[in-house]
Amino acid sequence: MMKLYNTLTNKLEDFVPIEQNKVKMYVCGPTVYNYIHIGNARPIIVFDVLARIFKYKGYTLQYVQNFTDIDDKIIKKANEEGKTCDEISEKYIEAFLEDIKEMNVIPEIIRPRVTENLDEIKKLINNLLKKGYAYKKGEDVIFSINKYKDYGKLSNQDLNSLTNGVRIEVDEKKDNPNDFVLWKGRKANEPYYESDFGLGRPGWHIECSAMIHKYLGNNIDIHAGGQDLIFPHHENERAQSNCGYDVNNEFVNYWLHNSYITINSEKMSKSLGNFKLLRDILKSYNGNVIRHFILTCHYRKNLNFSTEDLEVSKKTLEKISKSMSTFKMLNKGKEDEALEDILKEFKTNFILALEDDINTPKALACVSILIKKVNKLLATKESNVERVYFEIKDKMENILGIKLNEDKIENDKNKILEILLNIREKLRQQKNYELADKIREELAILGIDISDKK
């Protein structure tokens, strides 16, 4: 059974979906005012693996990841460049989709935009006003955290001692400094929209709650994102949705959060200026290498970025490809009985690792162990091990999303054949016809026929 670490309960829990054989999952997407950095890519890759696990296990998956396409940062960028917010957001949405395609992210993801869901956002704000959880100050609409007794539970904070989060807006209009804005009244030189409560635009937190409700319903199985979103963003989402919709106790059953990618033990972020753009890294390393690098560390642990570790991932994938090249060629004759046990153990341990809170480093270790065991088997006897090639290919590509270099595998095969043919020709020149004929016979078994010139 799948076990996931739930931030809400601070413990590892068995995963039980709301509906049998169906998973509804939402992952917070980017605010599209810049290219994404590799720290932004971590939740995209980690939760892509989770989605792949569910698909592999036969679940019907509904997966939503949003675009925040109206925001203070987008407005600032548009004003700086003399462009519209739509032009800025469109540019970086297109860039985002290009980047994640290079990272082999599954395409079956619903990607709504905030500006396409304003009616749903307004409905939720009206619900919160009617129920008394929100109040108006001028053209602003603000959520009152004191009205929701469970506020702070997700981030494990007490109402009386809340820490101001990075994106909490301190405003004299608020009854409580930690109250948060649902609707921002119109300001000069900013886009605005009409609503029952005045001209303005949505606040950051309300967007995700509304889009989750529209595309996935009142209750969902999994909500995921980076740990920096726990407070205030996800705390506020939880408050809005639990108060504004008719949910069954909690609108999210499992809250999952990945840890940071760091540089010199410091969190990578655009605000600190210590980030590495994903598309810049892609100029030197392909998406499979970057993906492998991210998956070598458990998602709830900090991962330090370094080109040295990217090189390790690159060489590791090259070694796996070379082994697969060998296994693919050894496809004649019978399989050794021991191979069945080796493969059975691999398949069991690989899936168990991923069911243990998405333990990707352990799953990758299972691949290395399999290769070592098969090579050890081949050192003692000849055996048909082509099935190992297909088993590794299946697990690496379909579950971990790491595509192995098929061209390299085919090139290695051709190089080995060329070496054998050169050796055979030298044997014939030395009149060692017995050994030369033996090589020809063995190649014929592999389906490669050689005709000697007379």
PLM regions with names:
Residues 9-12, 18-104, 450:
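N-terminal, positively charged nucleic-acid-binding surface of large information/translation enzymes
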Residues 267-270, 275-454:
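Structural preference for alpha-helix termini/caps and helix-kink/transition segments
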Residues 79-85, 109-115, 198:
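The substrate-binding groove and active-site-proximal loops of carbohydrate-active enzymes
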Residues 67-71, 93-96, 106-121, 139-148:
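Short, glycine/charge-rich beta-strand/loop segments that flank catalytic centers
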Residues 96, 101, 106, 125, ...:
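Active-site pocket-lining segments that scaffold enzyme catalytic pockets across diverse folds
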Residues 1-33, 48, 120-327:
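Alpha-helical recognition segments enriched in aromatics with Gly/Pro capping
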Residues 55, 101, 129-130, 256, ...:
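Alpha-helix C-terminal capping/helix-coil junction sites
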Residues 60-62, 132-138, 449-451:
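Short, well-structured beta-strand/strand-turn elements
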